[in-house]
């Protein structure tokens, strides 16, 4: 079983992530993680923090000379702004006189609607929001992207490749007829300000962000993750928590600000008749069954079909709105407006990078659950043996009725 945890606060000294259960022999370097974190900082609508956030990466354990050891991998992502926050976010007690007058230490008693502030204060008994927003911040996703880099490298060794793109930004949306991106498109996607390959749609998305910025608003959108060469049979139909789609949905919903997830055509499928909702089965060129479309997103009954795996995540507008929303000051009881922390207008393109990481972690777990292996080489052998054992369809005889009725299986 692959397990992962992160620790750390937004303005603390560092974020730390640990992933356990991955096999030995995965190629990964500090630079690989650094490059993945640089991709997380991409995207039109990001705030000033992205310009000076450096994400100083240190691999603390589980890797030697660029290969995983099979032991837990620990990665630290240092906060280059830590000296400015050293007293405010110190783990040990700080004398009150050293904190007095520090603007960064001001009590945040006007909770922001849509954030963890108010509910977290009520749940944990805090009298201000700082202890909540530090951990609830999407800065935590840097640690998840770091861990996802290792999982993604493992999948790459097995021929499984991941790509994501932005399909909607505010009211601007990619036409449904637009072809899916492939992994080779990653550099082109990352070079686009909103990570959308269609120039006309990309320009419309940029305009949406500009309009929101001028209006003192924030903006949400939808990202889609596509996974190529996923083998048949990841996940299971037998229990709810073993279903691959449920595991992916939970991982994506666990990303900050994600409010909806769909697999394949998802909600659009609900509006179709049954004959137009499902993927037909045909004889493939290799003699094995194949799907004639990908409406299900490569997952049926909780199991991967071997087709293109597609999942989408809807991100709400960032809750720290420059045009501050109405709230109540919990220290005075006065109705007022929410405090404003430095934030982005939008972070939808970055959400695609985080979603890639979460999908990679879930699929790495599912691959090892299905194929096992203490080393990459062993997992690869098991996968290749399974794929070779998937039977081809029999050659139809001349006397076989092409569309003969089978009768009702449940008379």
From Swiss-Prot:
Top-rank lineage group of the source organism: Bacteria
Keywords assigned: Amino-acid biosynthesis, Aromatic amino acid biosynthesis, FAD, Flavoprotein, FMN, Lyase, NADP
GO biological process: amino acid biosynthetic process; aromatic amino acid family biosynthetic process; chorismate biosynthetic process
One annotated Gene Ontology cellular component of this protein: cytosol
Gene3D superfamilies referenced in this protein's UniProt entry, alphabetically: Chorismate synthase AroC
Essential cofactor(s): FMNH2
Positions of FMN binding: 135-137, 256-257, 301, 316-320, 342
Spans annotated as Disordered: 278-299
Amino acids binding NADP(+): 40, 46
Catalytic activity: 5-O-(1-carboxyvinyl)-3-phosphoshikimate = chorismate + phosphate
CDD domains attached to this UniProt entry: Chorismate_synthase
Molecular function per GO: chorismate synthase activity; FMN binding
Assembly and oligomerization: Homotetramer.
Record's function text: This reaction introduces a second double bond into the aromatic ring system.
Protein known as: Chorismate synthase
Organism: Micrococcus luteus (strain ATCC 4698 / DSM 20030 / JCM 1464 / CCM 169 / CCUG 5858 / IAM 1056 / NBRC 3333 / NCIMB 9278 / NCTC 2665 / VKM Ac-2230) (Micrococcus lysodeikticus)
Lineage, uppermost ranks: Bacteria, Bacillati, Actinomycetota, Actinomycetes, Micrococcales
Gene coding for it: aroC
């Amino acid at each position: 079983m692959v397990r992962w945890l992160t620790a750390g606060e937004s303005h603390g000294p560092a974020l730390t992530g640990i992933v356990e259960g991955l096999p030995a022999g995965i190629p990964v370097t500090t630079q690989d993680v650094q490059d993945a974190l640089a991709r997380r900082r991409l995207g039109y609508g990001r705030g000033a923090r992205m310009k000076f956030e450096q994400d100083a990466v240190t691999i603390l354990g589980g890797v030697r000379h660029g290969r995983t050891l099979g032991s837990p991998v620990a990665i630290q992502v240092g906060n280059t702004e830590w000296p400015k926050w050293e007293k405010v976010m110190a783990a040990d007690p700080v004398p009150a006189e050293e904190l007095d007058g520090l603007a960064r230490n001001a009590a945040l008693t006007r909770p922001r609607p849509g954030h963890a502030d108010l509910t977290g204060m009520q749940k944990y008994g805090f009298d201000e929001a700082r202890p909540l927003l530090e951990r609830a911040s999407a800065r935590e996703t840097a640690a998840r992207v770091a861990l996802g880099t290792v999982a993604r490298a493992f999948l790459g060794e097995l021929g499984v490749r991941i790509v994501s793109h932005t399909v909607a930004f505010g009211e601007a949306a990619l036409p449904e007829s637009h072809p899916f991106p492939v992994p080779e498109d990653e550099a082109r996607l990352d070079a686009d300000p909103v990570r959308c390959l269609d120039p006309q749609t990309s320009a419309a998305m940029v305009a949406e962000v500009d309009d929101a910025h001028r209006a003192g608003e924030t903006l949400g959108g939808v990202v889609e993750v596509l996974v190529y060469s996923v083998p048949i049979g990841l996940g299971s139909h037998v229990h709810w928590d073993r279903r691959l789609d449920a595991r992916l949905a939970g991982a994506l919903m666990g990303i900050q600000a994600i409010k909806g997830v769909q697999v394949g055509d998802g909600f659009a499928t609900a509006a179709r008749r049954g004959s137009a909702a499902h993927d037909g089965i045909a004889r493939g060129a290799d003699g094995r069954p194949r799907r004639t479309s990908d409406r299900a997103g490569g997952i049926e009954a909780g199991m991967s079909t071997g087709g293109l795996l597609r999942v989408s995540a809807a991100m709400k507008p960032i809750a720290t709105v420059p045009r501050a929303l109405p709230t109540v000051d919990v220290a005075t009881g006065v109705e007022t407006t929410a405090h404003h922390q430095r934030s982005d207008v939008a972070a939808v393109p970055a959400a695609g990078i985080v979603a890639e990481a979460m999908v990679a972690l879930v699929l790495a777990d599912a691959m090892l659950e299905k194929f096992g292996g203490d080393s990459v080489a062993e997992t690869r052998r098991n996968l290749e043996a399974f794929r070779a054992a998937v039977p081809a369809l029999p050659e139809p005889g001349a006397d076989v009725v092409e569309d003969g009725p089978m009768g009702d299986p449940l008379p």
